[in-house]
A protein has these predicted regions:
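A charged, aromatic-enriched C-terminal amphipathic alpha-helix characteristic of glycosyltransferases
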Residues: 313-316, 327-359
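Short His-centered aromatic/hydrophobic patch
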Residues: 90-96, 116
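Membrane-proximal helix-turn-helix segments that form the acceptor-binding/catalytic region
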Residues: 29, 130-148
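Aromatic "clamp/platform" in nucleotide-sugar-dependent glycosyltransferases that forms part
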Residues: 272
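A short, active-site helix/loop in glycosyltransferases that binds the activated sugar's phosphate group
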Residues: 143-169
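A conserved mid-protein helix/loop that constitutes part of the nucleotide-sugar donor-binding site
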Residues: 19-30, 194-213, 230-233
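Nucleotide-activated donor-binding/catalytic signature segment of Leloir-type glycosyltransferases, i.e.
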Residues: 236-252
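Short alpha-helical donor nucleotide-sugar binding micro-motif in glycosyltransferases
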Residues: 251-252, 259-264
Length: 359
């Protein structure tokens, strides 16, 4: 089996809470152990800027200093055993990838993997200078990369078209979600939720119009917004006259979000494009109806789960679907069917990820 090393020079810049990130890697490792039948498999995480208060007993983690040179030397040290076959996974920022490229250099025993967690279509069509520079760097780097992980079939297709010269492996393995095992008999609520970053690219500007239309037909509906971002202040101002007053929680850890799902009856997503739709799937496995803007990903999800998810093309349509779901109940047998379908899909992707790392 190959040695697997994940390197990120600054996890404080990652949108995911570090505790959730560590938990995610622990789940990856457990899935690999189960699939490969090897309880002795290890993951080696080299992480910079990780808070000293964070503990990690279940997985092997090396804290890195702030010095980029020290980080590079620590990474080289972890790769120095002669003849050892290594899979080196670069964190999803420029510096992490650059340091990994230097560490790999001309070593043929190191397989370098990168992950693209964002929409490939968005990545390939940047709207600002920062995005254009990021795209340029990635396109220059892929010639030195062996594997690329993306999160959806559409991303796989778009990336293959963009880098026809790439002769490595591109595969699909989205971030897995936690699928509850307990039976769920949901209580009816009047809460419409949004979960995710409050950024322009998430279609936040459309939300007030939807909320206004919903308030006309269902004045007692409540709004819960979980997440933070550049548009939060604007959205709070636009919704300041709403009664009941919308609740803004800010960013929450995954464990805290899980505690909130039972409150929410319908999840709204206004994102014009979705790479995988992680929050949409989390809602569905927790018995929450979903109303989402029409795009390639949401259309596929609606086709898979037509009785519990609807896609919209304008605010009026969204409000109609939301109001309709408020009249319905997400029955236990529906939840079981959704969970089974998503788990089957997820297990297939975890096996693919385990193969790319350890085999």
């Amino acid at each position: 089996m190959r040695k697997v090393v994940f390197f990120h020079n600054n996890v404080s810049r990652v949108a995911t809470d570090p505790r959730d990130l560590l938990s995610r890697f622990h789940n990856y490792l457990q899935a690999a152990k189960d699939y490969l039948g090897n309880p002795n498999l290890e993951l080696n995480l080299l992480l910079g800027r990780i808070d000293s208060s964070i503990r990690f007993d279940a997985i092997k983690v090396v804290r890195l200093s702030r010095s980029l040179l020290s980080q590079y030397l620590a990474l080289r040290s972890s790769l120095k055993r002669p003849g050892e076959q290594v899979t080196l996974i670069a964190g999803d920022n420029h510096l992490s990838l650059l340091i990994c490229l230097f560490a790999k250099a001309r070593k043929t025993n190191i397989r370098l993997q990168i992950s693209i967690h964002t929409s490939v279509n968005t990545l390939l069509n940047p709207s600002n200078i920062s995005g254009k520079l990021k795209l340029k760097f990635i396109l220059l780097s892929v010639g030195f990369v062996d594997n690329i992980r993306v999160v959806s079939d559409s991303d796989l297709e778009n990336l293959r078209k963009a880098i026809t010269y790439f002769d490595g492996q591109i595969f699909v393995a989205p971030v897995p979600i936690e699928i509850p095992k307990a039976a769920l008999d949901r209580k009816h609520s009047h809460v419409l939720g949004m979960v995710g970053r409050l950024h322009p690219e998430r279609g936040v500007a459309e939300c007030p119009a939807i909320f206004e239309e919903l308030r006309v037909v269902r004045p007692k509906s409540e709004i819960l917004l979980i997440g933070d971002g550049a548009e939060r202040a604007w959205l709070e101002k636009k919704l300041s006259g709403f009664e009941p007053r919308p609740e803004f929680t800010g960013s929450l850890k995954q464990s805290d979000i899980r505690d909130r799902w039972p409150q929410i009856h319908v999840l709204l997503s206004c994102a014009p494009s979705e790479s995988y739709g992680m929050a949409l799937r989390e809602a569905l496995v927790n018995g929450v109806f979903v109303v989402a803007r029409k795009n390639k990903t949401t259309e596929l999800l609606q086709a898979q789960f037509p009785s519990v998810m609807k896609v919209f093309t304008n605010p009026s349509e969204a409000a109609i679907f939301i109001n309709s779901f408020f009249e319905q109940k997400f029955f236990p047998d529906m939840i079981i069917a959704v969970r089974q379908a998503i788990k089957s899909e997820q297990d297939k992707h975890l096996i693919q990820l385990a193969k790319s790392w350890f085999v």
